[in-house]
Amino acid sequence: MREKLQLIMKHLRQGSLQKMWKQTIWIYQYGRRYWKSMILYTLLGVMGSCVSLASSLISKDLVDIITGHQTGRLLSTFAAMIGFAIANLLVSQASGYASTFISLKVDSEIKNDIFAKMLVTDWESLTEYHTGDLVTRWSSDASNISSGILNWVPNLIIYTFRFISALAVVLYYDPTFALFALLGIPFSALMSRPLLRRMRNNNQKSAAMNAKMYGFNQEAFSNIQTIKAFDLIHFYTERLKTLQKDYINMRLEFQRMSILTSVLMSIVGFIVSYSCYGWGIYRVWNNAISYGTMTMFLSLSGTLTSSVNSLTSLIPSAISLTISAGRLMDIVEMPQEDYSQDHAVKLFEKQHKTSGIGLTMKDLSYTYHSGTEVFAHASMEAYPHEIIALVGPSGEGKTTMLRLILSLLRAQSGEFQICAGSDHNQKLNMSPSTRKLFSYVPQGNTMFSGTIAENMRNVKPDTTDEEIIEALKLSCAWDFVEKLPDGIQSIVKERGGGFSEGQAQRLSIARALLRKSPILLLDEATSALDVATERKVLKNIMQDTYPRTCIVTTHRPTVLNICTRVYAIRDKRCEVLNEVEIEKMVKEF
């Protein structure tokens, strides 16, 4: 007893029990949404238990009629047995269908909810997790939660009802037989203790290892070209073998413990079963019970044992549930983005749709969570019909600046606002809500699988073919698209497959232009274009009648002389370059 108290106190000090309780409450918040489905599933399960119990009783009567221990109508009893067998089949199938239907519904709704919460989670916090880990949590852990919500409490009620009803019948006919049937319970509970102690730790390690392997596979398949180019095939296959070996060793260590426990519990089960069988034979030999009663006892003995085992199995299921809940809580309880300005931004955009929207930044400072300071008192401005260039060495903060503009990152101090009006005095603070005012073309290939037209309509579902072609012309992509056999219906493979890097960039720019957002952000989005095409694309954007503000980051100064202003990001500030400095950069390039 003293050791148990010490163990409980140890868990309390470590916070394990409080954590499990918090995780249980979190699961309950989801579970109460589906109480009607849980009641339906429970009623079907209880009904099935009742039909099964009735079948055992009728089977007893049928055996006794055949052996002459009981008088009655053989045909009617046999018909009743068949009827209950059919009823059991129908209830079982109905329960299975309801379980599948409800499980799919609950699983999809919970995954949608978790997915939506992940998307509005603070971006910098979310990047602390590997995408493979996030996908594993969203898919495996969310499925575990949905399955547990539907099954755990209903099964607890169903198995308990099955156990109590079977025990009541056995006690009515022979209390001693019930004692034999229940002999295995304390042994099962005792032997399951060491397994349960290790189970939570093993489940945590297993979930982490699954996420690690998923992330490895995802990165490998996404970078097959690089793996081949650097002749890293052997290296990556060996890394996979190492990960698999670690996973196998971890699982086998736990499995050995499980096998030992299972063997011991099976031995106890055999002892209990044969004890019941021997006691039944003894009672029949003494004419204390009939053959039918003995067959019923043996049947109900199995029901009692299976019910206890099922109830015991709910414990590791609960442990697995709380672990999955904890892994999901790690994500959904991160800081959430604030979209309270949605309505204000919508009105702002409507009011200034014809005149355009720009942005102003004053004395902005930003430091990453890691402690790296990127900006200190930086200032910048960009207005409609302007092309603003951001230049500077790699790692100085150009991409970070665009993330701040998109409110993916939040500055610690300073003013950062969108602006409009003739003197730019109408302003609204930057927030996640202002993202709808931006079109963003990031570095790299951002095209999705599907046709060119489908890619364009991802950002504007109701756009016409003519509008798509016009956007392609602005980005200089129509030059090659019109030569394709299927035109805008041509297939784009995964990661822009089937098109060169420069072509994919022009398609990405066309998609951004098609959205008709007031502000366009191009992050090295013309790096794969030749100088002439790059200049033509930017000039087309400038000459477009739509009042657009354009901000580009670039390492190539060859287009700087067509930009309205050029900001050099250096020494944690944004400094406007004069014409002499720009010309010097162009000559030195």
Q: How does the language model describe each region?
A:
Residues T400, S439, G444, N455, ...:
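ABC-family ATPase nucleotide-binding domain "signature/switch" substructure
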Residues N112, A116, D330, E415-Q417, ...:
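ABC ATPase nucleotide-binding domain helical subdomain, centered on the C-loop/LSGGQ "ABC signature"
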Residues Y28, K36, W123-E124, S140-I149, ...:
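An intracellular "coupling" helix at the cytosolic face of ABC transporter transmembrane type-1 domains
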Residues R33, S37-C50, A54, D61, ...:
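Transmembrane helices of ABC transporter permease
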Residues M1-V51, T67-A80, S95-S99, S103, ...:
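Membrane-integrated ABC transporters
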Residues L406:
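Helix-to-loop junction immediately C-terminal to a conserved catalytic motif
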Residues L232, R256, L304-M334:
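Cytosolic ends of transmembrane helices, especially the final helix of ABC transmembrane type-1 domains
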Residues G31, S99-T100, L119-I164, S222:
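Juxtamembrane loop-to-helix connectors within ABC transporter transmembrane domains
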